[in-house]
Amino acid sequence: EIEARYPNIMRRVSGYNLDEFLTDSPFNMTKMIVGSEGTLCVVTEVKINLVPRPTMTALSVVHFQDIFGAAEAVKDILVHDPSSIEIMDNNVLERSRASTGLGSNMAFIEGTPGAILVVEFYGESEAELTDKTNKLKDDMASRSHGYACVNMQDRAAQASVWAVRKNGLGLLMSMHGDAKPLPFVEDTAVDPENMGDFVRRFDEIVRNHDTEAAYYGHASVGCLHIRPVVSLKKQDGVDKMLSIADEISDLVKKFGGSLSGEHGDGIVRGVWNKKMFGPDIYKLFQELKGTFDPDGLMNPGKIIDTPPMDQNLRYGADYSAPDMPTKLDFSIDTDFAGAVEMCNGMGACRQHVGTMCPSYVATRDEEHSTRGRANLLRAALSGKLPEGTMTSKRLWEAMDLCLECKGCKSECESGVDMAKLKYEFLDQYHRANGVPLRNRVFANINRLSVWGSRMAPLSNLMVSNPVGKMLSQMVLGIHPKRKPPKFVRQTFTKWFKSRQGPNPPESPFSKGGLGTATVVGTDTVVLLNDTYMNYNYPEIGKAAVALLEAAGLKVVLSDTKCCGRPMISKGLMDDATANAVSNIDQLYAYAEQGIPVIGCEPSCLLTFKDEYPQLVRDERANKVAENSYMIDEFLMKLQEGGKLELALGKLEKKVLFQAHCHQKAEMGTATSMAALRLAPGYQVELINAGCCGMAGSFGYEKEHYDLSMKIGEEALFPAIRAKDEDWEVAVMGVSCRQQVEDGTGRRARHLAEVLADALE
């Protein structure tokens, strides 16, 4: 019975491993425990076997028009003895291409394949691997398998391929709307020889239920992770899931396969074990479980005696969440609740590297992870927490340590945007509980800066002396170790307007007057005059003017209000919307003419691109967003179009670059690194660090100071200290530069200043 019922395939982890005990003793009980999913006993120590790492590897990426051709080709590729074959369909590929974090890794793709097979080979030499990959390529062509085969031995190129494969699952879950690719039949395994027919039959079942599926997995061993797209928020969706699962279990049984080739039975697949193994073997499973665990304490309800699939659902037919009015546009996710529900619980936000999630990295507390906050919001919205929780102090405490870095927006494979959710939460919270004075002050930092500049240098003395510091601590709760930026008497606006007189002053970065380079086409740009550039750091604006004019461009200074970022961060969405409308009114005429808006401060300029279309929701906002660029981004756009000639000398400089979190989330770091490398004498390195920990006003607030500095100590501060003083630190964000100075004692300058140093 066991020999007849157990699948004769490479991958089978369903049920208990009774087939390992058909021969006479001695028995190796390890084989019984492995795969038992904690239902039999607790493992306290393990002795494992190690195998040598391969000397070298190479990849062949075979492109197909559809998933069926890819599945059919597997048996012919196995003849070439690859170390592995991975399969990905167009759902994974297209989401990877659209992903901010993964889009740059897609250079290995030719055309728009419906599916690819990633074939890996081990070897001892380049020649051996070249021979293996070329033979496969020739064989694929002779058999008309696929339309392209890309071979690669370069490690970086291979890493790009594996990055796409690794993040495939999360990207699939980033599908917007209630229907998601769900893992209720996603671990089937069959003989690779039969994979082509199996995939066709699987697809027929799914399409007969008026839906589709996403495919990826380990094709070389016949284990496919196929996820039908289903919504479980209505009964017909739950019924569809049950019907598909029932038919797929029949299909797997017919093909002599296993419902689980890798992930185990758990709750989802355990319910089918009596059907798959028969009542006699299922009874043996129950007896085995009872012998090891007579009291049923060890992970109950898994493998055997499993509850029905439609119990214990995160969402179900009785799930509901209110349609909460919002200031930002959540229509891409249906509504606010839909954006919260984008979190599928994978927990990638609990990583210890990257930008996401700085508060979790520093606290190691689930509550302060993206997943923890999303779960609390979902529970509050759906009524699982007491009424009024959405505007409660307790939920505010959970949201408070979110630094609004947007790291989750790009690094969470599901695209959870906790910063956006926090903005809306704070808006609702303030409406119910009032707006604290400190929030009002920080949100309106632009107005404060106007008066600070008019009264400079007296204003600087007032805020830096002991009395001023004490007042800022008592009234605004600013930590005593934080230094506010100094105000300047001559604002950037005053300096810029003075250039229109008979003897206009040059930028201190200009060398010998304006550059002679020309730009084909539009020769005018609008420089966004942000708050900090205008009232605190006009040298950044002067550097930007020098660079843009050296590139042959005429610079016009914007007459805009504050971008609204401080208001958004503090949840004052009405105030932010008013500023957005005003700025769009002022800049739309330029956008209509194709005159670019250039920004130097990432948090300001990227507000135009990210939040403005969501706040104002009209075509003018979209037009302004499309017409707005960071200065490095714009320079490289000209460079790539062959329109930039910048006279940069051979000044030698070592530059260490730290990117702003919003920059990393919205546009990446490639343009900044490329812009700095325009200077031929510059040696440039990117700091591999996450959030700096300052996050605007967050790090100034006394209750956040320790956490802010701890985040900086995770990677940024040590990376800077590890470099000699002859390395200059370049940072785009104003709060990031302040954090670098406070944490390391090193002065950081803006990218525009550092690059302008090289102007001839």
Show which residues each predicted segment covers.
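FAD-binding subdomain of flavoenzyme oxidoreductases
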Residues: 1-73, 297-304, 309-334
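A glycine-rich phosphate-binding loop feature that marks nucleotide/adenosyl-phosphate handling sites
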Residues: 6-21, 86-102, 150-167, 216-229, ...
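Terminal amphipathic helices with adjacent charged low-complexity linkers/tails
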Residues: 46-51, 71-74, 78-179, 183, ...
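Short glycine/threonine-rich loop-to-helix capping motif typified by GTGT followed
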Residues: 95-109, 159-168, 225-241, 269-282, ...
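Ferredoxin-type iron-sulfur electron-transfer modules and their immediate structural context
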Residues: 179, 254-259, 266-401, 420-421, ...
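Iron-sulfur cluster-binding electron-transfer modules in prokaryotic oxidoreductases
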Residues: 293, 300, 315, 419-503, ...
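Glycine-biased, low-complexity coil/linker segments
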Residues: 511-512
